[in-house]
Structure formats: C-alpha cells, structure tokens
Amino acid sequence: MANTRVSKQITAAGTVVLRENPDGQTEVLLVHRPRYQDWSLPKGKLDPDEYLVGCAARETREEAGVNVRLGIPLDPIQYPVSAGTKTVFYWRSRVVGNGRQKANGEVDDAAWFSVREALDLVTYADERPLIRQAVALPDSTPLLLIRHGKALPRSDWDGIDSERPLDERGRLQSQRLTPLLDAY
C-alpha cells in the first residue's frame, strides 16, 4: 500500500530581539527550553486567525517575558518536522518597557548575550544567519497604512461620510487590528 500520509504546512513567527548594553555593545535575547535542551530565538506557532506579527510579539512575551516592538522583517526559515514542514517568519525587534513578566513553562531561562556569544550558543545553525542579518540592519520605524473597515452603505447614512459607522464586519476588522498595531 502506498504511503498516504499528508504533509502538513506549519507556520510560526518569532523575533530577533536586540538591545544596546551600557557599554554600547549589541546584545541578543535567547531563550532556553528544557524540553529540548536548546538555546534559541523566541518563536512559536500561530493561533487560529492570528496575524504573523501578532504571533511574533505574543510568543516573545510568553517565552521571554518581554514586550517588543517589531522592526524590519527578516528572512524566513523553513525546516522539516515530524508532521511536515515548518516555516518561521522573523522580525528584528526591540524591548519596550522595562519590566519583565513571568515567562511560560515552556522556557526556563531568557538571557541577553553578546552577538558572538549568541552565535556560539544558539543551538540551531539556521538561526545564526538571522542574528547576523538583524545586527547588520539599521534601526527603523515601521509605517503602517490602514484603511477604515467596512462601514454602513452610503445609501443608508444621511450624515457626514467621515462619521459613517462601521458595520458588524467593520467592527470585527477593527478588533482584529489591535494585536497587529500592538506589535508595532
């Protein structure tokens, strides 16, 4: 009998979090997962109906206990997993705020390392080029252009067009924007 196993495409998102230490040197945030005994960049799978950028920020918060603002997108990586193929999309990012939250149970340590230490310590070779790429890129400020959500039909509204309310679909679109905007 032929192998009828279907290969699944798994999508995930993560970050390369950078900061400048008091000596002016760039540092990289890595997380340690005891289950895999690895040091890696924060990342994880998308929740249903989640934006990639929202996933990247959420996973970094959950695994490393820090809030980030995303910057320039980095090259995605792709690798085989038991269920099929996993593609992980990454963003260069920086920490916002100065508090650390408790990380989830998946990670037992999150720590800052010099670029050289991070390159030596990170377990997966395909994450090294991402660190190099993030460090080489300039700081940036994303510009997001957003058009309003779905509104009531003009024919059903007698007031000023700029005050025309969103319909049910538009309100849902607006709610879905929150994690997207929060990531930037």
Regions found by a protein language model. Name each.
Residues 2-41, 143-149:
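N-terminal strand-loop-strand
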Residues 8-10, 23, 83-85, 105, ...:
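A generic fold-level signal
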Residues 23-67, 155-172:
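Conserved Nudix-box catalytic region and its N-terminal flanking loop in Nudix hydrolases
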Residues 28, 85-90, 142-143:
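Structural motif
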Residues 37, 77, 97, 150-153:
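Feature marks short, surface-exposed loop/turn motifs that line or immediately flank catalytic pockets
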Residues 44-134:
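Unchanged
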Residues 133-142:
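Short domain-boundary/entry signatures in modular proteins, especially
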Residues 143-184:
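Active-site-proximal alpha-helix that buttresses catalytic centers in soluble enzyme cores
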